[in-house]
Amino acid sequence: MARVTVQDAVEKIGNRFDLILTAARRARQLQLNQSAPLVPEDNDKPTVIALREIEKGLINQDIMDAQEFQKMAKVQETEEAAVALITE
């Protein structure tokens, strides 16, 4: 079992409640293969990987929001292009 000290991660995020929300969101992304891990997996579960990414400052709420916004913008562009092709 991997041992993870979350004190550094709490300091990066601000408080433990936001840490839980951020880590859960990131772990879900990893679990569903929506995003590749930013740290070596080392046979760890997605939750541990998420906490390590947060601890190293690679992931936070703002970064995930920006990534999600970019993905949504790409989807919207694709949909608009498809609609334009249909209406021509």
UniProtKB/Swiss-Prot annotation:
SUPFAM superfamilies: RPB6/omega subunit-like. InterPro entries: DNA-dir_RNA_pol_omega, Pol_omega/Rpo6/RPB6, RPB6/omega-like_sf. Pfam families: RNA_pol_Rpb6 (PF01192). GO terms for molecular function: bacterial-type RNA polymerase core enzyme binding; DNA binding; DNA-directed RNA polymerase activity. Keywords: DNA-directed RNA polymerase, Nucleotidyltransferase, Transcription, Transferase. Its EC number is 2.7.7.6. It is an enzyme of class 2 (transferase). GO terms for cellular component: cytosolic DNA-directed RNA polymerase complex. GO terms for biological process: DNA-templated transcription initiation. It comes from the Bacteria. It catalyses: RNA(n) + a ribonucleoside 5'-triphosphate = RNA(n+1) + diphosphate. Belongs to the RNA polymerase subunit omega family. Promotes RNA polymerase assembly. Latches the N- and C-terminal regions of the beta' subunit thereby facilitating its interaction with the beta and alpha subunits. The RNAP catalytic core consists of 2 alpha, 1 beta, 1 beta' and 1 omega subunit. When a sigma factor is associated with the core the holoenzyme is formed, which can initiate transcription. This is DNA-directed RNA polymerase subunit omega. It comes from Haemophilus influenzae (strain ATCC 51907 / DSM 11121 / KW20 / Rd).
